[in-house]
Amino acid sequence: MRIAAFQMEAKSGNQRFNVARLTRAAEEAASGGAKLLMTPELALQGYGAGNDLRALACPADGEMIEELNRISRKNNIALLVGFAEVAENAIYNSAAFVDGRNRPTIYRKSHLYGHFERAL
């Protein structure tokens, strides 16, 4: 299996911009034969959002994750994307695995580093 890593610098607070960049990366990776594209932590929201991260966080069953599923399906490539997840009145540093066919799989980071990550 060919795996592509997208080492992007996410634009803090601009999810639409970050999704557009991820879309182009998925197209490029798929055209190169990759079956999985991986992104860094918080690829959707970006680091540095500060207190705005709570407002930017998205649910695992929300529109942003569904958009990732559409990108995956259109390009025939699975995506592993870091994002700030809101659930149960809390924010999690999570990763979504989408393949365009099945329900997204969500992993919540459990070994948090430093005060910032523990405050999520």
Which stretches of residues belong to each language-model region?
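Active-site beta-strand/loop signature of hydrolases that rely on acidic residues for catalysis
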Residues: I3, N18, A26-L56, S72, ...
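Active-site-proximal beta-strand elements of phosphoester/diester hydrolases
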Residues: M1-K11, S94, I106-K109
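Catalytic metal-binding/acid-base residues of hydrolase active sites
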Residues: E9, A43, A84-E85, L112
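Alpha-helix N-cap and loop-to-helix initiation/capping positions
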Residues: G13, F17, R21, A55-E63, ...
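A short, hydrophobic beta-strand-centered structural micro-motif
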Residues: D61-A87
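Aromatic/hydrophobic pocket-lining residues that form π-stacking "cages" and hydrophobic walls in ligand
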Residues: L22-A25, L68
